[in-house]
């Protein structure tokens, strides 16, 4: 994954657990970190994001978290604390969408972004045999009550809150299971998020529960998704569906020009992907 830090381009090499930096012309400058347990090493890298006070935050694929200073020295290291008060037996006996213990990091399409001074956001999922979007008595609850984002304390690594229900389109249609991942970005207290099958972009601010929305459907997208009735069938066709059909891919906020960029795939019928540009919540370009 690429990211911008000051006037440099950063790239996280997951294989080597290293961060490579380049100048704005693409010329290599230096590398930081490696895999291990030493002072300048991490156990792995799945996601990295720059945060305030010239620090960095890393999440690996085993729920390990690393807070680093500007020289990539470890300030703190901990594991995600899901803050669940129930035992696994209690959770599975009576699963409820608000139970943090039912959730895990959505590693299929993970992302890490700071929100405000003290928090980070990352996507979560809870596809268990007891509550999922495919089958079972709790399927109806999945899209109406399940939450999709976790609010993590930078200081403690504790999940303070789960937020963001699936939008109405996921409750109305039953064929979106392979396109249920979230896309989002933040800037200071502003938080924009959407979902792969939804044309709307939702906006909320830290400390305010009001949610507004904007957005227009992308051009020439094939969204005639297939419906699946079992977890196995959906999983078996996951890669095939994501190659064949169109979906929204990513959101990026450009605060300096008051712009929001959203990329999308049209589907296998088109050799091109799409790019939308919004300014003050209005679409000004769609390429």
Regions found by a protein language model. Name each.
Residues 1-17, 249-252, 258-265:
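Beta-strand-rich domains and repeat architectures in extracellular enzymes and scaffolds
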Residues 29-35, 75-92, 160-167, 211-227, ...:
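Beta-propeller fold detector
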Residues 70, 137-156, 273-286:
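Beta-propeller blade signature
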Residues 239-286:
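Loop/turn-rich, solvent-exposed surfaces of beta-rich toroidal or solenoidal domains
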Residues 62-66, 70-136:
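Asp-box/WD-like beta-propeller blade repeats and closely related beta-sheet repeat scaffolds
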Residues 1-4, 47-51, 100-117, 178-187, ...:
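Structural signature of eukaryotic scaffold interfaces centered on beta-propeller domains
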Residues 123-144, 264-274, 278:
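Short, conserved, GDST-rich strand-edge loop motifs in beta-rich repeat architectures
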Residues 28-62, 78-88:
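Blade-loop segments of beta-propeller domains
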